[in-house]
Design a protein with these regions (language model features):
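Bacterial N-terminal signal peptides that target proteins for export
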Residues: 1-10
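N-terminal soluble domains immediately following signal/targeting peptides that reside
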Residues: 23-140
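C-terminal segment of classical bacterial N-terminal signal peptides
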Residues: 16-23
Length: 140
């Protein structure tokens, strides 16, 4: 009888712990004055040689506490560059239909750590930041 109770308790604990698993998104959010800028990969984990997107979400506080409003035309005077080691590539930024969301297609060619460098301004606020994004993994 005790063995049955232990097995049932173990199964219940396993089910509860599996239910608590959530996907982890390795997006990084930084604040620049009133703006929140989030950067990461569209498909995670990023894998070398597989087409992906560098994605951005740029918001400011909404009218109600705890809400945020997407910033349109944020890249009008803002440039994004992806950097790996000593190499860099300017990104062609596309607007997503959802306000405040942007993306740039890229095929990562090397495993390891990448940075996104943002330079310019958003509505008069100077932006000069580097945001680390999730490491690119190998195909094996």
């Amino acid at each position: 009888m005790i063995v049955v109770k232990i097995v049932i308790f173990g199964l219940m604990a396993l089910l509860v712990s599996v239910g608590m698993l959530t996907p982890s998104y390795a997006h990084t959010t930084v604040e620049v004055e009133q703006y929140k800028i989030e950067a990461g990969w569209g498909i995670e984990p990023p894998v070398v040689g597989i087409r992906n997107d560098v994605v951005f979400k740029i918001t400011e506080s909404g009218e109600t506490e705890g809400t945020y409003r997407g910033i349109t035309s944020a890249f009008q005077n803002l440039e994004a560059t992806v950097m790996y080691g000593g190499a860099s590539k300017n990104l062609d930024i596309n607007s997503d239909p959802k306000p405040g969301y942007y993306f740039s297609s890229i095929i990562p060619t090397k495993t390891g750590s990448y940075l996104v460098d943002l330079q310019g301004e958003i509505r008069g606020v100077i932006v000069d930041i580097q945001i680390p994004v999730e490491d690119v993994e190998s195909t094996s």
